[in-house]
């Protein structure tokens, strides 16, 4: 009961933080994908080679009074849908670096995006729509994992290599058009006796300038949370949440947008299942988020379906 009370208290603090007034990234799109980390975020891989995969879908909209820069124009009443399949081949040698197990991965993704908006043209607003199918940017990541009994820690550095489908004159893009560096860490409390687990991952993103638009997004902060309870050895249920807050203003945006700091928060349910495929243990996780307290970016909901396949024996 004490564990559950503490965990619920953390989620209450998260909601309070998310609702605190704070003043966006270019076009309302950030390098960091909020919610990409959930439960068990700081648990080290048990296999030297593995293939985590995430199927992702997001649908959101911005109010007609909320301006975003898309396609080199101010856009209002933006509606957007985005679907992608993330492939994350991961190498984690059974060695120690600073007392931690290392992990190195590269994320690549095919995806689809569609966007419609009322663009502020020279004479009068015009309804425009756009869609794109292609590949996103590449995200290399290096991690270190520590473990002591029920406590687990993780440190990471990742970044964006802007090689994905991108055109500054389009409403829809799969790449973000600029480089970025993100540094952070995570913690997981996992009690195998009681079945309770709590994870938190936090970090900061520094965005490089987009050379096509001379626009530089500000420094971003983000927090991903996961709380779960195992009902059997294979099945668990729980809650997830995220908060995303831009700390410093953009540069290069139209003067009418002001400092254009973005933010969003979300909560939702999750469930997970572990099953055997031959000698391999396959991890499957489904989680969904509903966004609130959003500013200077679309607001909606997203779904993650995660599956982790070990490619070598533990």
For every predicted segment, state its role.
Residues 25-27, 40-48, 60, 93-103, ...:
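Short loop/turn motifs that connect adjacent beta-strands in outer-membrane beta-barrel proteins
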Residues 33, 51-59, 104-112, 155-161, ...:
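Transmembrane beta-barrel strands of outer-membrane/channel proteins
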